Curated annotation (Swiss-Prot):
Na(+) binds at residues 244, 275, 278-279. Widely expressed. However expression seems to be restricted to specific cell types within individual organs, e.g. osteoclasts in the bone, distal tubules of the kidney or beta-cells of Langerhans islets. In sperm specifically present in the principal piece of sperm tail (at protein level). The gene is Slc9b2. It catalyses: Na(+)(in) + H(+)(out) = Na(+)(out) + H(+)(in); Li(+)(out) + H(+)(in) = Li(+)(in) + H(+)(out); Li(+)(in) + Na(+)(out) = Li(+)(out) + Na(+)(in). Allosterically inhibited by the N-terminal domain. Inhibited by phloretin. This is Sodium/hydrogen exchanger 9B2. The chain crosses the membrane at residues 87-104, 114-133, 145-161, 172-189, 201-227, 234-242, 271-290, 301-324, 340-357, 362-373, 391-411, 418-440, 462-473, 487-509. Residues 1-86, 134-144, 190-200, 243-270, 325-339, 374-390, 441-461, 510-547 are cytoplasmic. The lineage of its organism: Eukaryota, Metazoa, Chordata, Craniata, Vertebrata. It comes from Mus musculus. Electroneutral Na(+) Li(+)/H(+) antiporter that extrudes Na(+) or Li(+) in exchange for external protons across the membrane. Uses the proton gradient/membrane potential to extrude sodium. Contributes to the regulation of intracellular pH and sodium homeostasis. Also able to mediate Na(+)/Li(+) antiporter activity in kidney. May play a physiological role in renal tubular function and blood pressure homeostasis. Plays an important role for insulin secretion and clathrin-mediated endocytosis in beta-cells. Involved in sperm motility and fertility.
Amino acid sequence: MEDEDKTAECQHSKPPTGITHEAPPHHELQEERVMSLRGTDRSEPTEGSNLLTSGEKKPQDSPTEPNGLQSLRRFLACPPRGCLARVITNGTMVVLLWAMVWSVTGPECLPGGNLFGIIILFYCSITGGKLFGLIKFPTLPPLPPLLGMLLAGFLLRNIPVINDSVRIQHKWSSSLRSIALSVILVRAGLGLDSKALRKLKGVCVRLAMGPCIVEACASAILSHFLMGLPWQWGFILGFVVGAVSPAVVVPSMLLLQEGGYGVGKGIPTLLMAAGSFDDILAITGFNTCLGVAFSTGSTVFNIFRGILEVVIGVAAGSFLGFFIQYFPSRDQDNLVWKRAFLVLGFAVLAVFSSVYFSFPGSGGLCTLVMAFLAGMRWTDKKSEVEKVIAVTWDVFQPLLFGLIGAEVSIVSLRAETVGLCVATLSIAVLIRILTTFLMVCFAGFNIKEKIFISFAWLPKATVQAAIGSVALDTARSHGEKQLEDYGMDVLTVAFLAILITAPIGSLLIGLLGPRVLQKSEHRTEEEVQGETSAHIQRKPEDSITEA
């Protein structure tokens, strides 16, 4: 019986036929791979990972130091890092730049010298712009840094102790401002879009031309009767203050566009597109009136001379523009740098040579036309050239606004002159706001949006700084005291226009934008893709038909 029971147990313990407990070798390898993948991808603990994690000591067990002590240790680290390292680096660069120039020029780079004044003005303007850029208010766009640059130059000129050491000759100041004007005109010409020019209709054309022309005429009339300027100088003043500032409008519009305000009706796009054409119209009108004001002879001759300057500027700009389109050729090395150098070089040459040949109004037009025609063919590399020009502008912007501020002296200003300038500017700005409101009527905007566009078309800065001193420099080259007084009045109004309208316009845009503009709903890409996939699942035949 025991043998039979053992036989039965052995039969029960044997597996059924065709089934074995031993897995083949390749099956064991697959199991090992699966276990290794689980240990890595699914982060399941294994013996090896447990040993590794147990052997690592995390620094969380150590006592933490206060945040202030940690910041102090980082600040006093050796070698220095962070903020202290930046301060040391920038300070070394400033001292090194001065030392290099001093080693070449000698006394010119010592206090009271011309180059010393330029270097101090440059760094003070940069510092002022940085400080103003740090002033930020919630729900408001940042203050434009150009205000800090303008005030830095103004303070350097009007603080007695500093003014004795920081002196810049008029010739150097005029030349640097003219170079900055060339850079601005190149940026304006390259920024024009030929397709947008063809599509500009209706409200965009009215917004670009109407307020500028009306404000220029109003300023000319007011300055003639209130300030006693001749009609030619009145229109010079009018076109100086008639331009809107992209340096203030564009950053503010980008902030509103990111928040979705006014995007449904394209208000930010409209203002940014029309702003460029508004500036070009003001610069063109200024150059034409400048040529008429400094020409001699009869009125009919002066009118024909102004027309001749326009023709010369357009013709020279067309020739240079077509030349730069093909030279350098596309197969050359460093194509972007060569194009940027040629367009900047020809721009500076056009601005300076036009004054030399007594056609001051043709240089700006030549630069605008040249840059526009060159950019039409640079479609593939145009943005890269614009980046190089933008870097050049970053260098000359502090010089331009600092030099404009340094031209205004409190001692030479009379209270009645400032009062008349403020009155002329204020009335002209009110007329501009009303004109802008009328120009956007019958364009599909409600009353709140019309009010917003009217106030957004207020700030003035870049163009006023660029051309505000050109008339004064031209008058100084003629050596007539009366013309210099007229030029100083124009510069004073330009200075006050920047100082008053730039911060007020920026604040009004930031305050009114979120309150009066309709906010478009922002949908993420996942939501859009989800809606698209759901639509395809519901109507697959429609999507096939559309494809």
